[in-house]
């Protein structure tokens, strides 16, 4: 069985990493970021649900002893 020649693997891996780094740098350089970020006021919508206006009784779990 012939031996696998791995002498070119290192240059292939290094060139691939450099190429990926350059591509990511080019991709990230296309974004424009604001010079001074400002807070954006967001209004949270209020949802009314039927159970919010009703009174509900909270019961103790059955495992706890009764308090008198």
From Swiss-Prot:
InterPro entries: ATP8_mammal (IPR039017), ATP8_metazoa (IPR001421). The modification N6-succinyllysine is found at residue 54. Its main location: mitochondrion. It is a single-pass membrane protein. It comes from the Eukaryota. One of its GO terms (cellular component) is mitochondrial membrane. GO terms for molecular function: proton transmembrane transporter activity. Pfam families: ATP-synt_8. The chain crosses the membrane at residues 8-24. One of its GO terms (biological process) is proton motive force-driven ATP synthesis. Keywords: Acetylation, ATP synthesis, CF(0), Hydrogen ion transport, Ion transport, Membrane, Mitochondrion, Transmembrane, Transmembrane helix, Transport. The modification N6-acetyllysine is found at residues 54, 57. It is found in: Mitochondrion membrane. Subunit 8, of the mitochondrial membrane ATP synthase complex (F(1)F(0) ATP synthase or Complex V) that produces ATP from ADP in the presence of a proton gradient across the membrane which is generated by electron transport complexes of the respiratory chain. ATP synthase complex consist of a soluble F(1) head domain - the catalytic core - and a membrane F(1) domain - the membrane proton channel. These two domains are linked by a central stalk rotating inside the F(1) region and a stationary peripheral stalk. Belongs to the ATPase protein 8 family. Component of the ATP synthase complex composed at least of ATP5F1A/subunit alpha, ATP5F1B/subunit beta, ATP5MC1/subunit c (homooctomer), MT-ATP6/subunit a, MT-ATP8/subunit 8, ATP5ME/subunit e, ATP5MF/subunit f, ATP5MG/subunit g, ATP5MK/subunit k, ATP5MJ/subunit j, ATP5F1C/subunit gamma, ATP5F1D/subunit delta, ATP5F1E/subunit epsilon, ATP5PF/subunit F6, ATP5PB/subunit b, ATP5PD/subunit d, ATP5PO/subunit OSCP. This is ATP synthase F(0) complex subunit 8. It comes from Ceratotherium simum.
């Amino acid at each position: 069985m012939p031996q696998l020649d791995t002498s070119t693997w290192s240059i292939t891996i290094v060139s691939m990493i450099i190429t990926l780094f350059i591509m990511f740098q080019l991709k990230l350089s296309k974004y424009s970021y604001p010079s001074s970020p400002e807070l954006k006021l967001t209004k949270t919508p209020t949802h009314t649900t039927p159970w919010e206006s009703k009174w509900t009784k909270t019961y103790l779990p059955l495992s706890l002893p009764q308090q008198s």
